Amino acid sequence: MPDFSMRQLLEAGVHFGHQTHRWNPKMAPFIYGERNNIHILDLSQTVPLLNSALKVVSDTVARGGRVLFVGTKRQASDIIADAANRSAQYYVNARWLGGMMTNWKTISNSIQRLRKLDELLAGEAQGFTKKERLNLEREREKLDRTLGGIKDMGSVPDLMFIIDTNKEAIAIQEAKRLGIPVVAVIDSNCDPDQIDYPIPGNDDAARAIALYCDLIARAALDGIARQQGAMGIDVGAQVEAPVEPALQAPAEGA
């Protein structure tokens, strides 16, 4: 499991919430105090909750599950994609299309179209005029921006990790409807009740977002390593299993 320190959280500005007048009163239990009209989040609660979130990510991946990273705000977009790619997971970082999870069949059709365009444009796109090729490239670019990060996901994910629960409210609603657990950073203006595995922290500062995403990615990689280790043990057990009865048979007959 990835390690982190209280100092790292402080240096990344994880403890800085929003202006006090913008708060969600449901966040009161996670607020340490206020300074210059800014809420300060209680990092002594963030540490164990972040550890719990990292464990659920690792455990999900270890049993073959998929994690979907969601963060479409400007300062999260690139970080989200990088973390998901680095940990062999999936992401939505441009725009959440309504029904992305609850209407997976329609989304799958769009993904098939994206794959088809990839194939067409990978070759010389023979038989197309310059204008036709340009139109195909534009269509592909548009589809890739919204669906490129989930193109290989295969079906809905087993866990979602979200930056900015207010901005990604539709994604959270869809996860709830499908029973997909949600790990999310909750700032002082968020509703923690919607989140299965909340991480109290700043969801605006790029350094804080980069820290969460790096830790979640490393937890996923930890899960992959555990899954591969378990598979190795299983394979070994399967190889040995047929030998045991054969060795025991003569003893039973004797």
UniProtKB/Swiss-Prot annotation:
Pfam families: Ribosomal_S2. Belongs to the universal ribosomal protein uS2 family. Disulfide bonds: none annotated. It comes from Brucella ovis (strain ATCC 25840 / 63/290 / NCTC 10512). One of its GO terms (molecular function) is structural constituent of ribosome. It comes from the Bacteria. The lineage of its organism: Bacteria, Pseudomonadati, Pseudomonadota, Alphaproteobacteria, Hyphomicrobiales. One of its GO terms (cellular component) is cytosolic small ribosomal subunit. This is Small ribosomal subunit protein uS2.
